[in-house]
Regions:
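Absolute protein N-terminus
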Residues: 1-3, 99
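Residues at structural and domain junctions
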Residues: 2, 18, 74-78
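Compact nucleic-acid interaction/catalytic patches
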Residues: 3-6, 10, 15-48
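Short conserved beta-strand and strand-loop elements enriched in small hydrophobics
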Residues: 50-53
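C-terminal terminal-subdomain/extension
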Residues: 55-99
Length: 99
C-alpha cells in the first residue's frame, strides 16, 4: 500500500484514495478519501474537491468525507494519483487548517 494509491470502494461506489503517510504502513488501518462520480457528487467546493479522470469518467474527491478504514477493505490498487499530490494535499490542508 502506498500513499495516493486508488482502490475500488468495496461498497461499489467509486474509489478510495489512500492519503496516509507510507511511514505509518505498519498500522492496520489507512486514512482514505472517497472518489465519487462527479455526476452524483454534491456541488464541489473549490480546492476541497478536485476532480480526477479515472477509467474514462470524472470522479470528485470528497475530502470532507475522509475516514480511516481497515486495510482488509483495500485490495489491489487500480490507479495512483501521485502526479496530483499537491492538489490532494491542498484539499486536506483546507479541510484541516482552513488554508
Amino acid at each position: 500500500m502506498a500513499r495516493l494509491d486508488v482502490y475500488r470502494n468495496p461498497d461499489g461506489n467509486g474509489f478510495l484514495l489512500d492519503v496516509q503517510a507510507d511511514l505509518m504502513s505498519h498500522l492496520k488501518s489507512r486514512l482514505v478519501i472517497p472518489l465519487v462520480r462527479s455526476d452524483i457528487a454534491p456541488l464541489p467546493i473549490k480546492v476541497l474537491n478536485p476532480v480526477f479522470e479515472l477509467e474514462d469518467a470524472l470522479y470528485m474527491l470528497l475530502t470532507q468525507q475522509m475516514a480511516a478504514v481497515s486495510i482488509r477493505m483495500l485490495k489491489s490498487p487500480v490507479h495512483n494519483v501521485n502526479d496530483r499530490r499537491d492538489e490532494v494535499v491542498a484539499a486536506i490542508d483546507l479541510l484541516l487548517q482552513g488554508i
